[in-house]
């Protein structure tokens, strides 16, 4: 009867470990799995799908927060507000393409002045000024 019986130290119950901590994630794998099942996206949901989706969502959130934090620091602020998220997303090419149709509430608009509305250069070109003297 090899293999039967209690192993040494098996008296202590195993501590429960969440799927998020097993995967080394902060986002809730169990909750995402529940949403995937309740959403009827498919008849069945694989065990790895919610882990992968949680990792992707966590990465995107970290990316946006890092860029928004940089935007807040550039504006000499210590708190991230929707304006900083808007500036971060719209200044990043890939995030802007991903969230192109998304409206960020209280985000404002991107600063942009059309070139025709900008004042003319005061100095101009030296050749043009010299050419006018000959006439």
UniProtKB/Swiss-Prot annotation:
It comes from the Eukaryota. Belongs to the histone H2A family. It is found in: Nucleus; Chromosome. SMART domains: H2A. PANTHER family: HISTONE H2A (PTHR23430). It holds the Pfam family Histone. This is Probable histone H2A.2. Signal peptide: none annotated. One of its GO terms (molecular function) is protein heterodimerization activity. Keywords: Chromosome, DNA-binding, Nucleosome core, Nucleus. Core component of nucleosome. Nucleosomes wrap and compact DNA into chromatin, limiting DNA accessibility to the cellular machineries which require DNA as a template. Histones thereby play a central role in transcription regulation, DNA repair, DNA replication and chromosomal stability. DNA accessibility is regulated via a complex set of post-translational modifications of histones, also called histone code, and nucleosome remodeling. One of its GO terms (cellular component) is nucleosome. The nucleosome is a histone octamer containing two molecules each of H2A, H2B, H3 and H4 assembled in one H3-H4 heterotetramer and two H2A-H2B heterodimers. The octamer wraps approximately 147 bp of DNA. CDD domains: HFD_H2A (cd00074). GO terms for biological process: heterochromatin formation.
């Amino acid at each position: 009867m090899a293999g039967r019986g209690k192993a040494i130290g098996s008296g202590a119950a195993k501590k429960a470990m969440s799927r998020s901590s097993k995967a080394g994630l902060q986002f809730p794998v169990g909750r995402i799995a529940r949403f995937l099942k309740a959403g009827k996206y498919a008849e069945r949901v694989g065990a790895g799908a919610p882990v992968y989706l949680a990792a992707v969502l966590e990465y995107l959130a970290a990316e946006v927060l890092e860029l928004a934090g940089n935007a807040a620091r550039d504006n000499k602020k210590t708190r991230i507000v929707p304006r900083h998220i808007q500036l971060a997303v719209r200044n990043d090419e890939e995030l802007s393409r991903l969230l192109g149709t998304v409206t960020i509430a209280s985000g404002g608009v991107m600063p942009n002045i059309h070139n025709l509305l900008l004042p003319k250069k005061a100095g101009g070109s030296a050749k043009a000024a010299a050419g006018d003297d000959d006439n």
